[in-house]
Amino acid sequence: MPTPRPARTLVRGKQWTARKSVDTAKFEAIAGAILASLDAGPIAFGELSARVERLLPRFDGSVSWYTITCVRELEVRGQVVRQEKPVRYHLSGR
């Protein structure tokens, strides 16, 4: 009997022409780590990715790819705000 495929989540980013389909468990793990990492205030992407990697040291996949993909979805959902020049991320409402 074939192994069932893991659940997928469609993610979108502002100005993306197509959605990306990612493993739901990975999305939830990365999204949770992003939200926990942004609790301290606005940070650059490199620092955000490093914090996520520290929170998920055994993550199976590219932490930086999943971080940018998930942070853009959280931005569309209104949970995260991306500031321009220099680009910084922070929680919505801060």
What is the meaning of each model-derived region?
Residues 53-69:
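Short, positively charged loop/turn segments that connect secondary-structure elements
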Residues 42-54, 58:
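Short acidic, hydrophobic short linear motifs in intrinsically disordered regions
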Residues 75-84:
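A short, conserved structural fragment
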Residues 23-42, 66, 70-76:
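Positively charged, polyanion-binding regions of nucleic-acid-associated proteins
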Residues 1-29:
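Long, low-complexity, charged/polar intrinsically disordered regions in eukaryotic proteins
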Residues 43-47, 62, 66, 84:
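Alpha-helix N-cap and coil->helix boundary residues
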Residues 37, 55-59, 77:
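Alpha-helix C-capping/helix-to-loop hinge sites
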Residues 85-94:
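Short, cationic-aromatic polyanion-contact patches
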